[in-house]
């Protein structure tokens, strides 16, 4: 008889094969739930709603350091992005370069979220803009946020204002009360209020005019492709059934292989149609998204270093503190 486990993740091409059953975990019956990550992380950190769940890497490090031992991390990495390249600014703000963010009012959905961690890290290490140089305005409330579930307090020397419940990052960007925003989503959920499409608004633009070019520049210089979300499992399940960890990892490897095959087929069709250059064929076949500790150690350790630097954790979190011991050599 298979072991039934509830699992929750956000829908994307690399997780959907788990949801639709094309990628199965041996010996496990997965009861899959697709949940927006902002709500998912709050519910898991607050209520432990699922046996296995996608999880913010930043929030997991914070929870573990604070003594929350309910979960253990799995090095299954579902989303990545060059987050700093997508900072939004008002066109009339006079913000033309990252250095211009100093002294400005900047909105963030949640200060401790991994996307904001990476954005602040890039601003500081690439452009000399410290979190202490910015006045932050946070949308999520203490009762409905990852930080509310982990006891978040603004780091020393950093100004983090709470946005009133009748406002949001989106509304304050349009009113001019905010001049810039980090990792803006514009999708209302159980914990998010912003709903305005700022990316297509005539008064708003990205700080970096060519977001793809900035991502390429950053990657070529640093070798970092920032990880946003991983997975976690209830510690009691992992300890009672240690085989589950590797079977879950194999299932997500299968899901990733399906996604890669579909991506390559789509790219091939676009090349044949003249929508992509021939040079894209080799680039798109390179496997840049991998699971496991070994392939991602530099990225994970950089995130841990940023967490310490930014005052989210008070000690440098070792990967051994966060992830299952049996995965450390994978």
Where are these regions (language model features)?
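Secondary-structure end/capping motifs
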Residues: 232, 237-309
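Conserved C-terminal helix/tail region of periplasmic/extracytoplasmic solute-binding proteins
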Residues: 312-330
């Amino acid at each position: 008889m298979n072991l039934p486990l509830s699992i929750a993740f956000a829908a994307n091409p690399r997780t959907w094969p788990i949801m639709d059953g094309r990628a199965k975990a041996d010996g496990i019956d997965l009861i899959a739930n697709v949940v927006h990550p902002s709500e998912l992380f709050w519910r898991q950190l607050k209520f432990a709603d699922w046996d296995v769940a996608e999880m913010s890497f930043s929030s997991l490090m914070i929870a573990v350091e604070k003594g929350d031992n309910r979960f253990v991390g799995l090095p299954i990495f579902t989303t990545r992005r060059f987050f700093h390249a997508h900072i939004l600014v008002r066109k009339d703000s006079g913000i033309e370069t990252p250095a211009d963010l100093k002294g400005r009012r900047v909105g963030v959905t949640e200060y401790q979220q991994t996307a904001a961690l990476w954005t602040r890290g890039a601003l500081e290490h690439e452009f000399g803009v410290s979190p202490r140089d910015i006045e932050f305005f946070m949308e999520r409330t203490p009762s409905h946020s990852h930080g509310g579930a982990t006891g978040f307090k603004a780091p020393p020397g950093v100004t983090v204002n709470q946005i009133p419940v009748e406002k949001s990052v989106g509304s304050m960007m349009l009113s001019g009360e905010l001049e810039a925003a980090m990792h803006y989503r514009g999708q209302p959920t159980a914990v998010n209020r912003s709903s305005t499409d700022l990316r297509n608004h005539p008064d708003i633009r990205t700080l970096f005019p060519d977001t793809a070019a900035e991502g390429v520049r950053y990657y070529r210089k640093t070798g970092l492709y920032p990880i946003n979300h991983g997975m976690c499992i209830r510690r009691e399940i992992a300890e009672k059934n240690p085989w589950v960890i590797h079977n879950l990892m194999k299932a997500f490897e299968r899901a990733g292989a399906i996604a890669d095959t579909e991506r390559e087929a789509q790219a091939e069709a676009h090349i044949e149609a003249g929508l992509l250059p021939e040079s894209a064929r080799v680039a798109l076949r390179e496997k840049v998204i991998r699971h496991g500790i070994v392939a991602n150690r530099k990225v994970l350790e950089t995130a841990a270093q940023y967490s310490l630097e930014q005052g989210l954790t008070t000690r440098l979190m070792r990967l051994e503190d966060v992830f299952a011991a049996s995965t450390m050599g994978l």
